[in-house]
């Protein structure tokens, strides 16, 4: 019974293996037929063996297909056989092929997605590599710089460009065939991601626009710098003129000018100059008063008859002690003068001090 079970298990395993091989062969044939069935207006060629990648770029997680001709009209397709497909429908059977993760071409579309059924048959898609970053890539991606606004999800975009006519047009129409240009938008690839020609042109236009904006901003910054330099030069000249004027003011102010004395500050110089000006004004006022008093005394002495001698005698008569002091002090006038005038005349002579003199005159009999 155990032998029967083993035989049954062996038969079942052989049936499964035969079924797996037949399914793999049919799937490979269907893929080969689908890839080799050339649609109108498209020329497809088989992919050459994949190039050896350098060790530095062997860990690239994404592979893209390169055009077969310089114009990019054809597509490089992987060999029909694969070492084991991923994504629920990959082709298997041959050990020499390279697997494309997640690629499934069937009646429902590419990769089992009905939304992609509108793509022409045999169009190459760069699918998300998923988590298998260590697997070998199918082909090198086209050269070019990576656009700064690419998505970082590692997907590749398929750009279909029509050459001015319907893709289903006759192959004889010049330039009427559909050109499929691939663009890989993988943020992990720093220099190997391909860009469509339009993308490169757009980025070039944006760069030129940015260059124009940078030129205008640099011009504005230069103008602002020149204006700031002019303002600084004007302020520097103004401060130099102010310092020179203050030095001249310190030179005329009477204070101790010596190396041991600290130089006056600007505020101290101005305060000292103000006080000096006020002092000079007060001295001038005192001088004016003195000059006015002297002029008034000269007019009084010229108008009096006995002149100053009579005034001295009158003062001696009124104040004997003062007269004796003046004589002892060597008063230049002699005492032997004519008698003094009457009291009203004295009051008229000394009108400035008539308050006490006239009072004495009025009190006399």
UniProtKB/Swiss-Prot annotation:
Organs and tissues of expression: Kidney, lung, brain and pancreas (insulinoma).
Coiled coil: none
Intracellular or extracellular location(s): Nucleus
Domain of life, per lineage: Eukaryota
Gene Ontology terms for molecular function: DNA-binding transcription factor activity, RNA polymerase II-specific; E-box binding; protein dimerization activity
Predominant cellular place of this UniProt entry's protein: nucleus
GO cellular component: nucleus
BP GO annotations: axon development; positive regulation of transcription by RNA polymerase II; sensory organ development
Record flagged with keyword Repressor: yes
Keyword Transcription: yes
bHLH domain ranges (all copies): 226-280
InterPro entries: bHLH_dom, bHLH_transcription_factors, HLH_DNA-bd_sf
Gly residues biased stretches: 82-93, 191-216
Keyword vocabulary terms for this entry: Nucleus, Repressor, Transcription, Transcription regulation
Span list, region Disordered: 34-93, 134-156, 188-225
Record's function text: Inhibits DNA binding of TCF3/E47 homodimers and TCF3 (E47)/NEUROD1 heterodimers and acts as a strong repressor of Neurod1 and Myod-responsive genes, probably by heterodimerization with class a basic helix-loop-helix factors. Despite the presence of an intact basic domain, does not bind to DNA.
Quaternary context: Heterodimer with other bHLH proteins, like TCF3/E47.
Protein name: Class E basic helix-loop-helix protein 22
Organism for this UniProt entry: Mesocricetus auratus
């Amino acid at each position: 019974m155990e032998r029967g079970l083993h035989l049954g298990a062996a038969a079942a395993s052989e049936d499964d293996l035969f079924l797996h091989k037949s399914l793999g062969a049919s799937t490979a044939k269907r893929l080969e037929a689908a890839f080799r069935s050339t649609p109108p207006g498209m020329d497809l060629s088989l992919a050459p063996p994949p190039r050896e990648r350098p060790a530095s770029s062997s860990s690239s997680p994404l592979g893209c297909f390169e055009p077969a001709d310089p114009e990019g009209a054809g597509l490089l397709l992987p060999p029909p056989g694969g070492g084991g497909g991923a994504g629920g429908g990959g082709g298997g059977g041959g050990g020499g092929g390279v697997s494309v993760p997640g690629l499934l071409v069937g009646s429902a579309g590419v990769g089992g997605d009905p939304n992609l059924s509108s793509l022409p048959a045999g169009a190459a898609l760069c699918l998300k590599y998923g988590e298998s970053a260590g697997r070998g890539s199918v082909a090198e991606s086209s050269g070019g710089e990576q656009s700064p606004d690419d998505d970082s999800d590692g997907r590749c975009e398929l750009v279909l460009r029509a050459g001015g006519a319907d893709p289903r047009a006759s192959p004889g129409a010049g330039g009427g065939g559909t050109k499929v240009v691939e663009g890989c938008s993988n943020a992990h690839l720093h220099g190997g991601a391909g860009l469509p020609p339009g993308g490169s042109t757009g980025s070039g236009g944006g760069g030129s626009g940015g260059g124009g904006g940078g030129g205008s901003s640099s011009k504005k910054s230069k103008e602002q710098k020149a204006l700031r330099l002019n303002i600084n030069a004007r302020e520097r000249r103004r401060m130099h003129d102010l310092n020179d004027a203050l030095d001249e003011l310190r030179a005329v102010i009477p204070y101790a000018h010596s190396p041991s004395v600290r130089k006056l500050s600007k505020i101290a110089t101005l305060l000292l100059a103000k006080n000096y000006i006020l002092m000079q004004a007060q001295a001038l006022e005192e001088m004016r008063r003195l000059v006015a008093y002297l002029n008034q005394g000269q007019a009084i002495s010229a108008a009096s008859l006995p002149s100053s001698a009579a005034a001295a005698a009158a003062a001696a008569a009124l104040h004997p002690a003062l007269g004796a002091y003046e004589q002892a002090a060597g008063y230049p006038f002699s005492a032997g003068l004519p008698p003094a005038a009457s009291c009203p005349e004295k009051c008229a002579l000394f009108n400035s001090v008539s308050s006490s003199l006239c009072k004495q005159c009025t009190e006399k009999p």
